Each structure stands twice: as C-alpha cells, then as structure tokens.
C-alpha cells in the first residue's frame, strides 16, 4: 500500500481566487442592494493555503471605504452560502472584505511623478541676479 502526500495542484489557488472574485462580483451586482455603499469593484481575492479564509479586496467610488467594508462584511455570511451553491468544492472560504488602498496610492504616486516631470524652472538652476540699483 502506498502513501501519497497531499500536494496542491499547481495554479489551483489562483484559479479558485479568480473564480471566487468573478462569482462574488456577479452576486454583489445582481443580488445585493449596495446603493448605500457606492460603486464597488472587486480588485482581487487572496486565499489562505488551506482555502479556509479569503481576503476580498475592493475599491469604492462615491462612498466611504469603511462604510462599504462594513456593509460587505455584514453580507459576508450570505455571500458565503451563495458561493457554496456555485462552487463545487469541499471548503468554501470564510470571506473578509478589505478596502484596496493600492489603487489610490498609485494615483497619488502618478500625480507626484507628473508634477516632478512638469516643465518649469529647475530647483538646482541659480536665479538670475537682480539688476543693480541706481545709487545716487
């Protein structure tokens, strides 16, 4: 009798995370009234190694990120039960919604780069000397 070590299937984590993101986006769009939370976009899903937990990253437009996260986390149990019906896997991860601040940071960094590249007087160029005043 041979023993087999349990090895995860290469790429399964990424495929499952993508499928969870796709299914959650559809459920949120079709089934939930998220008008109080603004426009929500799911930007990624990060699964734990045992698939028991998932961090779902989102961005929001037109509302406070904390309020949107609270509303999404309030609905996490219902979304989990709906995922169980859609995904045909043994363990459906517990969902935790987290605001994705990387996009906002990227926009800020882009603005800083644009400002630094703007044509204008360089900081290391000396100013033109003032004209001598007439001393009489």
From Swiss-Prot:
It holds the Pfam family RBFA. Residues 124-136 have a biased composition (Acidic residues). One of its GO terms (biological process) is maturation of SSU-rRNA. GO terms for molecular function: ribosomal small subunit binding. It is found in: Cytoplasm. Residues 114-136 are annotated as: Disordered. Keywords: Cytoplasm, Ribosome biogenesis. Monomer. Binds 30S ribosomal subunits, but not 50S ribosomal subunits or 70S ribosomes. Belongs to the RbfA family. One of several proteins that assist in the late maturation steps of the functional core of the 30S ribosomal subunit. Associates with free 30S ribosomal subunits (but not with 30S subunits that are part of 70S ribosomes or polysomes). Required for efficient processing of 16S rRNA. May interact with the 5'-terminal helix region of 16S rRNA. This is Ribosome-binding factor A. It comes from Bordetella petrii (strain ATCC BAA-461 / DSM 12804 / CCUG 43448).
């Amino acid at each position: 009798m041979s023993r087999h070590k349990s090895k995860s299937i290469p790429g399964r984590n990424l495929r499952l995370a993508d499928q969870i993101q796709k299914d959650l986006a559809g459920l949120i769009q079709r089934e939930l009234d998220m008008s109080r939370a603004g426009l929500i976009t799911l930007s990624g899903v990060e699964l734990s190694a045992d698939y028991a937990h998932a961090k779902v990253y989102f961005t929001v437009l037109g509302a406070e990120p904390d309020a949107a996260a609270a509303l999404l986390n309030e609905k996490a149990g219902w979304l989990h039960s709906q995922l169980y019906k859609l995904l045909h896997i043994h363990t459906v991860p517990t969902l935790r919604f987290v605001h994705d601040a990387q996009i906002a940071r990227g926009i800020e960094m882009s603005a800083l780069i644009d400002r630094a590249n703007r044509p204008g007087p360089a900081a290391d160029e000396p100013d033109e000397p003032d004209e001598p005043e007439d001393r009489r």
